[in-house]
Structures are given as structure tokens and as C-alpha cells.
A protein has these predicted regions:
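Active-site-proximal loop/short-helix segments
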Residues: 33, 80, 84-142, 181, ...
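Substrate-binding cleft/loops of secretory-pathway carbohydrate-active enzymes
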Residues: 93, 171-194
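Surface-exposed cleft-lining segments at the edges of enzyme active sites
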Residues: 57, 133-153
Length: 194
């Protein structure tokens, strides 16, 4: 209802309307939908850094179906021009240096509490693709294929969602992680150039 009202006001004033919605941050959904950190903790019960980092597992097919339906319902509103994806990424495995003092952190490595997603499905899919059991690796941050796997999960979901929204004649915009592409890949597993 809020998107409908705001989009109508925007159009009356000659503006485009981008319906901004956080993508991967949600509360109150089935526990099996949440990403799992390297310690085996689900993001609905233990969050890295801040309580709102209740991050969904972007590789979970039920999560994908839920989000696609949610975005399509908003895109179906006649006066919505764009759906805008925010938090279309994993939580920060490394926080930006400017935030270290705020949280009393020294981020000199990828810490298990902030490193997602180690759910059974992601681990099994990665092992099937690479032969690597990522849970048995002493330092998963050194396995570039593991970081790339998670980047690909985000990219593949965005492409799937965009195809659905574009088929409705609507557009998609996104809030992407700031800074060089290499920081987005390293810190939040997002390849916004793809």
C-alpha cells in the first residue's frame, strides 16, 4: 500500500518511482531460509555486527521464490517504474575500515561469525562443482572458488529476478556495495559489474 501511494504521488509530480526494498534482510521467516555462518549459526538467531543482519540464504529456492513473488507484486503496481534491490548481497565478511572503531574490531581476517553461507545445500553444491568440502578447509578465505561460488549465487539470483521483472515491462535498479568492484567481491560477495 505504501508503494502504491508513494508511486502515485511521484508520478503526479513528474518523478520516476523506484520501490526500494531490502532484498536479503528479513525477520520472521522460516529458520531454514536464513544463511548459516562458518560456525554453523543461522542468521535469524545470531547476527554479525548488528541485529538487523538477519540475512536470508540467496541460494535457497524457497527464498528465491518468496523474493521473486514479493518483487513482482510491487512491480505489478501501475505507477511503479522500478523495483530497487538493496542488500542484494551477503553480510559484510569484512567491515569497511571506517567502521572498525565503532564496533571495537580489528578486521585482519575473515571471521567465522560473519562468513556466510555454510548451510548444507551450499556446501554440497560447492563440493559437487569443485570436489572441495569447504567445511574441512582450515582457512576457507584462501579458497577463491568458494568466494566466487557465493558471488555467482548472488549474480544468478539477480539475473533470474530481473528476467521476471523485465517480462512485466518494468525495470530494476540496485543499491550496490560502494567502492572498487574488488572490495564488493571480497567484503560482501557481490559482483555488481555482472
Amino acid at each position: 500500500e505504501h508503494a502504491r501511494i508513494a508511486s502515485e504521488v511521484a508520478h503526479r509530480n513528474g518523478l520516476e518511482f523506484h520501490a526500494w526494498m531490502p532484498c536479503m534482510l528479513h525477520k520472521g521467516l522460516p529458520s531454514s531460509w536464513y544463511a548459516v555462518n562458518r560456525k554453523g549459526e543461522r542468521a535469524d538467531s545470531v547476527q554479525a555486527y548488528v541485529p538487523y543482519y538477519t540475512c536470508l540464504d540467496p541460494n535457497n529456492k524457497d527464498v528465491q521464490a518468496y523474493l521473486i513473488d514479493k518483487y513482482k507484486r510491487v512491480a505489478a503496481l501501475p505507477s511503479v517504474d522500478y523495483v530497487q534491490l538493496d542488500y542484494i548481497r551477503y553480510p559484510d565478511v569484512i567491515l569497511a575500515k571506517g567502521l572498525w572503531s565503532k564496533y571495537n574490531l580489528v578486521m585482519n581476517e575473515e571471521y567465522p561469525t560473519a562468513d556466510y553461507c555454510y548451510c548444507d545445500d551450499c556446501v554440497a553444491e560447492f563440493k559437487a562443482k569443485t570436489g572441495i568440502d569447504i567445511r574441512s578447509v582450515q582457512d576457507p578465505s584462501k579458497v577463491k572458488a568458494w568466494a566466487q561460488f557465493r558471488c555467482d549465487v548472488i549474480t544468478n539470483f539477480v539475473n533470474k529476478l530481473c528476467a521476471e521483472i523485465h517480462a512485466m515491462g518494468k525495470k530494476v535498479s540496485a543499491d550496490v556495495f560502494p567502492g572498487p568492484k574488488s572490495h564488493a567481491v571480497w567484503m560482501v560477495r557481490q559482483e555488481w559489474n555482472k
